[in-house]
Amino acid sequence: EIIRPTAFFKSLSGQIDRVKKGKSFLIFGNGELTSCKPISARDLSKFIIPLVTRSQSENKIHIIGGPGPPISPKRQAELLFELCKKEKKITHISPKLFLVITYALIPLSIVSKKIRDLREFLKIAYYYATESMLFWDEKIGSYSSNKTPEYGNESLEEYYKKILKNDVVYKELKDQKLF
């Protein structure tokens, strides 16, 4: 069994501190290039337990999202500014910047493992900045939020509220700061 959540709440929380400090929210492209249906760790655990405890495996990929409509980075930014009661400031960054830097670092990557690792991170960042984390519908050749299975009842908005009230221990994120 492969369980593929569309996104985790934590992975969409990297810019909370920026917004709380009144800084701009970083968005790739127009902020509508990608979307996902994030799921909480608790809801995902409840989804996984019956799969791993059953007697026979189905040997399939389980794409799973949280409840409700998909959220784009633009909507995520709007939600955070609203919850933090801050003026909306958004900085748009071209996702192609990841590719430009990746290619510019090729010569240095020959002699440096750190640079090779950085190039790999930039490739992954480009993917996440340009591809939705939803069900890929082969018939229509695009992502489908309608066909992305939903599970649970915890929302990203409620998670953000808990972080902002300090009801959830929120640790500094490293790689998630862009998302």
Language-model features: where?
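Oxidoreductase cofactor-interface core, primarily capturing Rossmann-like NAD(P)-dependent enzymes
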Residues: 1-86
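Residue-level detector of short coil/turn "hinge" positions at structural boundaries
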Residues: 87-88, 170
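General small-molecule cofactor/ligand-binding pocket signal
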Residues: 89-93
